[in-house]
Amino acid sequence: MVTATATATNVGYITQVIGPVIDAEFPSGKLPEIYNALKVEGTTESGLKVNVTFEVQQLLGDNRVRAVAMSSTDGLVRGMPVVDTGAPITVPVGQPTLGRIFNVLGEPVDQGEPVQAQEFAPIHRSAPPLVDLTIKPEPFETGIKVIDLLAPFKKGGKVGLFGGAGVGKTVLIQELIHNIAEEHSGLSVFAGVGERTREGNDLYNEMKESGVLDKVALVYGQMNEPPGARMRVGLTALTMAEYFRDVNKQDVLLFIDNIFRFVQAGSEVSALLGRMPSAVGYQPTLATEMGNLQERITSTKQGSITSVQAVYVPADDLTDPAPATTFAHLDSTVVLSRSLAAKGIYPAVDPLDSSSTILQADIVGEEHYNTARAVKQTLQRYKELQDIIAILGLDELSEEDKLVVARARRIERFLSQPFFVAEVFTGSPGKYVKLADTIKGFQRILSGELDNLPEQAFYLVGTIEEAIEKAEKLKSK
C-alpha cells in the first residue's frame, strides 16, 4: 500500500467557474497531472470561508486545466489562488476508520473526534496484477434462504442487487451487513453513493443499536452533493477495503449503494466537461469508468473483497446501458421483483431471474445443486400454468399440475424470511438460516411430505421446523 504525501509548491488561479467545475491557469511548465487534487482556501469579500478540493480531469492547453469539485463551489470567484497538492486525493486507511462516517475526501462527518490514522492512501490505484489473483470458487453463506439456495454468493466475488425504486435493495444490504458482522465477525466497508441522507442516517443508527458499527467503515456521498463527490466516493471506500485486504490480509465485504448513482454522477461530470454523450445520454467512457472500479474489487492471495452492489434499474428496464454494463462484471445477480413485493413476500428476490455462476454441482455439491434445480423447475411450471389458471380456473388442471401449484405456492412463501433489521416494522424476530437447514427445508416441501400444511404456515419463517410449529398454532386457532 503506497502512502501518498502532498507537496504544495505549485500555485495557479481560477479563470472560470461553471457550477461544480473550474478552469485554473498555472505557471508555464508547472501543470498539475490528471487526477491530482487541487485546493482552494480563503475568505470571500462577503466573509464566507471557502475550502474546496478539486480533482484535475482535463488539460486544456495554454497552461489551463479543468477540474471537478468534491464539495460546494459557493463563494468561488475568478482570480482566487489554486494550490496543486502534487498527489491524488488521499484518505485515511486501517483500523481507525472502523465505526466512523467519512466523506469522499476521507474527512470524518459524524461529529466525532479527529481520526487518528497512521496511514493514508491515494484513491486512484491500478488493479492487482494477474499473478496475485486467486481463482478458487467458494460459496459464502449469508443466512438468507433464497440467496444461499438459488443465487449463492462467491467468496471474493461481485454480487448485483437489481431492482426498481422501493422494492427493498437497501434493506437487503443492511441485513447482509448485520449477518456478516454477527455470524462471520467480518469487516465491512459501506459506500453510500448518491443515495438519501435519511437512509445513511438510519443505517448508522441501526448499526449502532445492533452493535455492529465497530466492524464497519462508512463512506457517504449523498444525493445533495456535487457530481464529483458522488463519482469518487466509491473509490474512497474501495481504497479503505483494499488496505484491509492487502495489508491486514483480511476478508472484507464492500457494499455499494447505489452503483447506478456512480454512473449517473459520471454522466453529469462528462456533460460538464463537454464530452459528446453516448447511448441514452450516458458518458462515452461508461465502460472504462465501470471497469476501473470493478477490476480493483477482487480476491488476491492475501485476502478477498466480496462486493455487494445495489443497482437501481431505471424504469425497471434491464437493457438500460447502466445496469447492462454492470451485469458484465458480476458473479451473482439477485433480481428484486415488484410483483413479489406487492404480494408481501420479502425479501422480494425473484427466484427465476436471480442466478449465480457458482451454482454448479462440483462447487456447491450435488445435494444443493439438485435441490435448487428442482425448486426452479417447480416455480417455472407454476409460472407457465398461471395463464391457464387465470382463464379456466384451478379446477381445470390435471391432478399432477394441481400438486405442482400447491408445492410452488408453499416454496414461494418459504422463500420469504423475517429480517433482523426489519424487526421494528414487522414485529417478527429476525432469522439466520444455515445453508444445510435451507436445503433440508426445501427438500421436504418438494418430496410432498408437508403437502397437508396450510400455505400460510410457510410465510415469514426461518427453518422448516418453524413452519411446522406455525401450522400447529394455526390449527389450534
Swiss-Prot record:
Q: How does it assemble?
A: F-type ATPases have 2 components, CF(1) - the catalytic core - and CF(0) - the membrane proton channel. CF(1) has five subunits: alpha(3), beta(3), gamma(1), delta(1), epsilon(1). CF(0) has four main subunits: a(1), b(1), b'(1) and c(9-12).
Localization, UniProt: Cellular thylakoid membrane
Tell me which Pfam families the record gives. ATP-synt_ab, ATP-synt_ab_N, ATP-synt_VA_C
Instruction: Give the bilayer topology.
Output: Peripheral membrane protein
* SUPFAM superfamilies per record: C-terminal domain of alpha and beta subunits of F1 ATP synthase, N-terminal domain of alpha and beta subunits of F1 ATP synthase, P-loop containing nucleoside triphosphate hydrolases
Family affiliation: Belongs to the ATPase alpha/beta chains family.
Catalytic activity entry: ATP + H2O + 4 H(+)(in) = ADP + phosphate + 5 H(+)(out)
Question: One GO MF term, please?
Answer: ATP binding
Q: Which cysteines are joined by disulfide bonds?
A: none
Q: What is its main location?
A: membrane
Name its species.
Synechococcus sp. (strain JA-2-3B'a(2-13))
Q: What does this protein do?
A: Produces ATP from ADP in the presence of a proton gradient across the membrane. The catalytic sites are hosted primarily by the beta subunits.
Asked whether the keyword Phosphoprotein is assigned, the reply is no
Q: Which residues bind ATP?
A: G163, G164, A165, G166, V167, G168, K169, T170
E.C. number(s) listed in UniProt? 7.1.2.2
Write down the HAMAP family for this protein, in alphabetical order.
Answer: ATP_synth_beta_bact
NCBIfam families for the chain: atpD
SMART domains listed in its UniProt record: AAA
Give the UniProt keywords, A-Z.
Answer: ATP synthesis, ATP-binding, CF(1), Hydrogen ion transport, Ion transport, Membrane, Nucleotide-binding, Thylakoid, Translocase, Transport
Q: What name has this protein been given in UniProt?
A: ATP synthase subunit beta
What Gene Ontology cellular-component terms does the record carry?
plasma membrane-derived thylakoid membrane; proton-transporting ATP synthase complex
Which CDD domains does this chain map to?
Answer: ATP-synt_F1_beta_C (cd18110), ATP-synt_F1_beta_N (cd18115), F1-ATPase_beta_CD (cd01133)
